[in-house]
Amino acid sequence: MKVVVLAGPESSGKSWLAEQLQAHFGGILVGEYVRYFIEQNARDTCFDDIPAIARGQLDWEDQARALRPLLLILDTHLLSNMLWSKTLFGDCPPWLEPELLNRHYDLHLLLSPDDVEWTQDGQRCQPFLADRQLFFNASRQWLELHQQPLQVITGDWHARHLQAFNAVKQLLV
Protein backbone atom coordinates (compact mmCIF):
# COMPACT_ATOMS: atom_id res chain seq x y z
CA MET A 1 0.00 0.00 0.00
CA LYS A 2 1.25 3.47 -0.94
CA VAL A 3 -0.05 6.45 1.02
CA VAL A 4 -0.13 9.88 -0.61
CA VAL A 5 -1.07 13.01 1.34
CA LEU A 6 -2.11 16.32 -0.17
CA ALA A 7 -0.82 19.10 2.06
CA GLY A 8 -0.65 22.87 2.04
CA PRO A 9 -2.85 25.92 2.44
CA GLU A 10 -6.52 26.26 1.64
CA SER A 11 -7.64 26.91 -1.93
CA SER A 12 -4.47 25.44 -3.46
CA GLY A 13 -6.23 22.52 -5.14
CA LYS A 14 -5.83 19.69 -2.64
CA SER A 15 -9.36 18.29 -2.82
CA TRP A 16 -9.55 18.73 -6.58
CA LEU A 17 -6.22 16.99 -7.12
CA ALA A 18 -7.09 14.22 -4.68
CA GLU A 19 -10.25 13.50 -6.67
CA GLN A 20 -8.34 13.62 -9.98
CA LEU A 21 -5.70 11.23 -8.66
CA GLN A 22 -8.30 8.80 -7.33
CA ALA A 23 -10.25 8.88 -10.61
CA HIS A 24 -7.10 8.09 -12.59
CA PHE A 25 -5.13 5.73 -10.34
CA GLY A 26 -7.94 4.21 -8.30
CA GLY A 27 -7.48 3.40 -4.65
CA ILE A 28 -9.28 4.98 -1.74
CA LEU A 29 -9.67 8.71 -1.14
CA VAL A 30 -10.08 9.98 2.43
CA GLY A 31 -11.58 13.46 2.70
CA GLU A 32 -11.24 16.22 5.27
CA TYR A 33 -13.01 15.34 8.50
CA VAL A 34 -13.09 19.00 9.59
CA ARG A 35 -15.43 19.84 6.69
CA TYR A 36 -17.82 17.09 7.83
CA PHE A 37 -17.50 18.31 11.44
CA ILE A 38 -18.37 21.91 10.52
CA GLU A 39 -21.33 20.82 8.39
CA GLN A 40 -22.66 18.53 11.15
CA ASN A 41 -22.29 21.16 13.87
CA ALA A 42 -23.31 24.19 11.75
CA ARG A 43 -20.75 26.45 13.41
CA ASP A 44 -17.12 27.46 13.32
CA THR A 45 -14.65 25.37 15.25
CA CYS A 46 -13.09 26.29 18.58
CA PHE A 47 -9.95 25.03 20.29
CA ASP A 48 -11.91 22.47 22.30
CA ASP A 49 -13.02 20.88 19.00
CA ILE A 50 -9.47 20.11 17.81
CA PRO A 51 -9.14 16.72 19.55
CA ALA A 52 -12.47 15.50 18.13
CA ILE A 53 -11.56 16.74 14.65
CA ALA A 54 -8.12 15.13 14.77
CA ARG A 55 -9.52 11.85 16.11
CA GLY A 56 -12.18 11.89 13.41
CA GLN A 57 -9.52 12.38 10.74
CA LEU A 58 -7.44 9.55 12.21
CA ASP A 59 -10.48 7.28 12.35
CA TRP A 60 -11.27 7.89 8.68
CA GLU A 61 -7.62 7.28 7.78
CA ASP A 62 -7.43 4.10 9.87
CA GLN A 63 -10.63 2.71 8.35
CA ALA A 64 -9.17 3.21 4.87
CA ARG A 65 -5.78 1.76 5.85
CA ALA A 66 -7.51 -1.36 7.18
CA LEU A 67 -8.80 -2.05 3.65
CA ARG A 68 -5.18 -2.17 2.38
CA PRO A 69 -5.76 -0.50 -0.99
CA LEU A 70 -2.84 -0.33 -3.40
CA LEU A 71 -3.14 3.46 -3.21
CA LEU A 72 -4.49 5.50 -0.30
CA ILE A 73 -4.98 9.20 -1.05
CA LEU A 74 -5.44 11.52 1.92
CA ASP A 75 -6.93 14.93 1.18
CA THR A 76 -5.32 16.00 4.47
CA HIS A 77 -3.82 14.58 7.65
CA LEU A 78 -2.84 15.64 11.16
CA LEU A 79 -0.29 18.19 9.94
CA SER A 80 -3.14 20.34 8.70
CA ASN A 81 -5.04 19.92 11.98
CA MET A 82 -1.90 20.81 13.92
CA LEU A 83 -1.06 23.91 11.86
CA TRP A 84 -4.64 25.18 11.72
CA SER A 85 -4.93 24.79 15.48
CA LYS A 86 -1.78 26.87 15.95
CA THR A 87 -2.88 29.42 13.33
CA LEU A 88 -6.39 29.93 14.69
CA PHE A 89 -5.88 29.36 18.41
CA GLY A 90 -2.14 29.77 19.04
CA ASP A 91 -1.81 26.23 20.39
CA CYS A 92 -2.55 22.61 19.59
CA PRO A 93 -3.10 19.46 21.62
CA PRO A 94 0.32 18.00 22.52
CA TRP A 95 -0.51 14.49 21.28
CA LEU A 96 -1.04 15.54 17.62
CA GLU A 97 2.60 15.75 16.57
CA PRO A 98 3.74 12.43 18.12
CA GLU A 99 0.70 10.72 16.58
CA LEU A 100 1.54 12.19 13.18
CA LEU A 101 5.18 11.11 13.46
CA ASN A 102 4.09 7.60 14.40
CA ARG A 103 2.46 7.08 10.99
CA HIS A 104 4.01 6.22 7.65
CA TYR A 105 3.33 8.28 4.53
CA ASP A 106 5.02 7.52 1.22
CA LEU A 107 4.61 10.94 -0.38
CA HIS A 108 3.36 14.39 0.54
CA LEU A 109 2.22 16.53 -2.38
CA LEU A 110 2.74 20.01 -0.91
CA LEU A 111 0.70 22.52 -2.88
CA SER A 112 1.91 26.09 -3.20
CA PRO A 113 -0.65 28.90 -2.89
CA ASP A 114 1.05 30.83 -5.71
CA ASP A 115 -0.38 31.10 -9.23
CA VAL A 116 -3.94 30.06 -8.34
CA GLU A 117 -6.85 32.18 -7.18
CA TRP A 118 -8.31 31.92 -3.69
CA THR A 119 -11.94 30.77 -3.81
CA GLN A 120 -14.42 31.25 -0.98
CA ASP A 121 -16.44 28.14 -0.16
CA GLY A 122 -18.05 29.08 3.14
CA GLN A 123 -15.36 27.44 5.29
CA ARG A 124 -12.16 29.15 4.14
CA CYS A 125 -10.64 32.04 6.07
CA GLN A 126 -7.34 33.03 4.41
CA PRO A 127 -8.16 35.25 1.43
CA PHE A 128 -4.74 36.92 1.57
CA LEU A 129 -1.93 35.22 -0.31
CA ALA A 130 0.60 36.20 2.38
CA ASP A 131 -1.36 34.20 4.98
CA ARG A 132 -1.52 31.17 2.70
CA GLN A 133 2.20 31.47 2.00
CA LEU A 134 2.90 31.40 5.75
CA PHE A 135 0.84 28.21 6.04
CA PHE A 136 2.68 26.69 3.07
CA ASN A 137 6.06 27.62 4.59
CA ALA A 138 5.09 26.14 7.97
CA SER A 139 3.98 22.93 6.24
CA ARG A 140 7.20 22.70 4.25
CA GLN A 141 9.36 23.46 7.27
CA TRP A 142 7.67 20.72 9.32
CA LEU A 143 7.88 18.13 6.52
CA GLU A 144 11.55 18.88 5.86
CA LEU A 145 12.46 18.98 9.56
CA HIS A 146 10.94 15.53 10.02
CA GLN A 147 12.42 14.20 6.77
CA GLN A 148 9.05 13.39 5.27
CA PRO A 149 8.98 12.56 1.54
CA LEU A 150 7.56 15.51 -0.34
CA GLN A 151 7.07 16.98 -3.78
CA VAL A 152 6.21 20.67 -4.03
CA ILE A 153 3.41 21.28 -6.53
CA THR A 154 3.36 24.70 -8.22
CA GLY A 155 1.97 26.57 -11.21
CA ASP A 156 -1.47 26.85 -12.72
CA TRP A 157 -4.10 24.11 -12.50
CA HIS A 158 -2.77 22.26 -15.54
CA ALA A 159 0.81 22.32 -14.21
CA ARG A 160 -0.35 21.09 -10.80
CA HIS A 161 -2.25 18.24 -12.42
CA LEU A 162 0.81 17.15 -14.43
CA GLN A 163 3.22 17.39 -11.50
CA ALA A 164 0.95 15.47 -9.13
CA PHE A 165 0.20 12.75 -11.68
CA ASN A 166 3.88 12.32 -12.49
CA ALA A 167 4.82 12.11 -8.80
CA VAL A 168 2.19 9.46 -8.06
CA LYS A 169 3.04 7.54 -11.22
CA GLN A 170 6.70 7.40 -10.10
CA LEU A 171 5.64 6.28 -6.63
CA LEU A 172 3.59 3.42 -8.03
CA VAL A 173 6.31 2.11 -10.37
Question: Each PLM stretch: what is its role?
Answer:
Residues 6:
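Hydrophobic anchor at the beta1->P-loop junction of P-loop NTPases
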Residues 89-159, 172:
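A glycine- and Lys/Arg-enriched "phosphate-lid" helix/loop adjacent to the NTP-binding pocket
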Residues 1-3, 69:
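Pre-Walker A (Motif I) flank of P-loop NTPase domains
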Residues 9:
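P-loop (Walker A) phosphate-binding loop of NTP-binding proteins
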Residues 14:
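Conserved lysine of the Walker
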Residues 44-90:
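Conserved nucleotide-sensing/catalytic segment adjacent to the nucleotide-binding pocket
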Residues 19-62, 164:
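Conserved substrate/cofactor phosphate-moiety recognition/catalytic segment
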Residues 31, 74-76, 111:
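Active-site flanking residues adjacent to catalytic metal/cofactor-binding acidic residues
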